[in-house]
Amino acid sequence: MAIHPKVKDIIVEQLGVDPDKVKAEASFIDDLGADSLDIVELVMAMEEEFDLEIPDEDAEKLKTVQDVASYLEKKGKA
């Protein structure tokens, strides 16, 4: 599954990582060096960009780039 370009852009902008590192299987914490605050800011940026609310219990399950892409697709946003 292709990663929505906006998702990738937000991750690169929020985490300050090399776009080449943003792959579907990349873990936000282990591979992209995010901490819990980064994750909160990332979720907030996704909510704003895609005009949806991501409940905390869902946000806690978003561990990888693919998790976010799948979640947005399920919500009809990507």
Swiss-Prot record:
PROSITE patterns (UniProt xref): CARRIER, PHOSPHOPANTETHEINE
GO molecular function, one term: acyl binding
Biological process according to GO: lipid A biosynthetic process
SS bond list: none
Superkingdom of origin organism: Bacteria
Intracellular or extracellular location(s): Cytoplasm
Keywords: Cytoplasm, Fatty acid biosynthesis, Fatty acid metabolism, Lipid biosynthesis, Lipid metabolism, Phosphopantetheine, Phosphoprotein
Main location: cytoplasm
One GO CC annotation: cytosol
Post-translational modification: 4'-phosphopantetheine is transferred from CoA to a specific serine of apo-ACP by AcpS. This modification is essential for activity because fatty acids are bound in thioester linkage to the sulfhydryl of the prosthetic group.
Record pathway: Lipid metabolism; fatty acid biosynthesis
Carrier domain segment(s): 1-76
Positions where O-(pantetheine 4'-phosphoryl)serine occurs in the chain: S36
Annotated function: Carrier of the growing fatty acid chain in fatty acid biosynthesis.
Family: Belongs to the acyl carrier protein (ACP) family.
HAMAP family in UniProt: Acyl_carrier
Protein name in the entry: Acyl carrier protein
Gene designation: acpP
